[in-house]
Curated annotation (Swiss-Prot):
It comes from the Bacteria. It catalyses: (6S)-5,6,7,8-tetrahydrofolate + formate + ATP = (6R)-10-formyltetrahydrofolate + ADP + phosphate. It comes from Nocardioides sp. (strain ATCC BAA-499 / JS614). Its EC number is 6.3.4.3. HAMAP family: FTHFS (MF_01543). This is Formate--tetrahydrofolate ligase. The keyword DNA repair does not apply. It is an enzyme of class 6 (ligase). GO terms for molecular function: ATP binding; formate-tetrahydrofolate ligase activity. Gene3D superfamilies: Domain 2, N(10)-formyltetrahydrofolate synthetase (3.30.1510.10), Formyltetrahydrofolate synthetase, domain 3 (3.10.410.10), P-loop containing nucleotide triphosphate hydrolases (3.40.50.300).
Amino acid sequence: MLSDIEIAGAATLRPITEVATESLGIGAEHLVPYGHYKAKVGITYLNSLADRPLGRLILVTALSPTPPGEGKTTTSVGLTDALHGLGKRAIACLREPSMGPVFGLKGGAAGGGYSQVVPMTDINLHFTGDFAAIAAANNLLAALIDNHVHHGNELDIDVRSVTWKRVLDTNDRALREVVVGLGGPPNGFPRQDGFDIVVASELMAIFCLTESWADLKRRIGDIVIGYSRAGAPVTARDLGADGAMAVLLRDAIAPNLVQTLEGAPALVHGGPFANIAHGCSSVMATRAGLRLADYVVTEAGFGADLGAEKFIDIKCRMSGMRPDVAVVVATVRALKYHGGVALADLDREDLGAVEAGMDNLRRHLDNLRHLNGVPCVVAVNRFPTDTDLEVVRVVELAASYGVPAYQATHFTDGGIGAQDLAKGVLQALEEPARDEFSFTYPDELSLTEKVEAVATRVYGAGQVTWDGKARKRLARIERDGYGTLPVCVAKTQYSFSTDPGLLGAPTGHELRVREVRLSAGAGFVVVICGDMMTMPGLPTRPAATRIDLADDGTIIGLS
């Protein structure tokens, strides 16, 4: 089989104006083209759609992933193509890839095989410049903080309390902790600082949760960058940074329109990680999709304990959206991995391991159905090494839980390989809801109680423990009036626990909170657990070493 980049390179793409006009009814005058195959959809035009009825929202999530990944984006694209092939007006709403994983371990995030969004190389690299705009706005605020201190510190900022970090879209562990302002008085006031990856930043979260230009500026102004020496919060608005930062993001918050390999429309916009951020594409893009199409397929990062929980408890809570059905992606190899099989042996048939690994899938299904009231369908994303017996067993066991499951071969077959899944999703959408939609916790709980609710109800933890510094920070956040905000838990994606090696569906484990960060502009509190880092490092053999540029300008090795 051809590689992802070879498949994408051989595709014949429709002009983006044609995709917009024929698939979505958007006139060319409402697009801001970035070449022939990608464009931003004008915000003024999107605002004019406010009275249109909303389509149905399909959330694609997964069981706890294995290191190679289970294909949520690929399934989202394949399902969109399948719905499109069935004559439905469907659109995908996906996250933009970060160049950190592209050049690191995971690789790109534009789908795979014959279920990709294109132009794949553009999307995986600079795309329309959204991440660069976010980084510029973020780092402008960092510069204004240090400049304010250098020129007299009128706000009396306690430099030891500054929490705002610089960012870049690269995995670079050497920049996690740095000292700035060295070299004497002309270079500013020396202080400890650090870098986060763009997709873990508060500004990325603001970008993805904002609903308008006014909302963008308000949220940016609400950012708390640190505290005065008297203990009062200091905001971006206090520094006069909100206007300039909003200007840098004015055009970027317009959703990006591209297409799948089969010509279906896709809005690819925003890209927070789900393990160290809230893991969902932008509200602007999702709401646009719901007004432009009858069916919106969107994905939330990693397993349902991370991306789907945050989709529901953060994105839905703030936007008022509700998923009509969740498609939970499972693979035979992931089930065997959670059933105790080593990575090197996942290609061997093992029905016993498949059955043991179903505990992990079942907990995700139970959480979505019974805790949040979201109907579920299982997509068995089939790999060539899966046997018929293994796939049939997954379908049987899911059915025994009361959840329909469908084999999908969209990676190798494109949209036609996901048509059974699409028909199953359409059927699920026609059935009356059995449970009422609900959040994992109400707003009025304390921050401690909210973390405990996620830990015990979603993760199956027995207790939550707090490092002393984290507990003090939490108390200060509540004292400053932010106790009603939702929580965004940052933890490993590989387990319900904070131990990536604790697979399956563990119970009674301890959730250790190491650090707490206030994201007042985004509107949530980040709770960092275990050993999670908000600036990843590169692996022993980075993907960057396999990517090259041919003499004719062709990009090689991007996946």
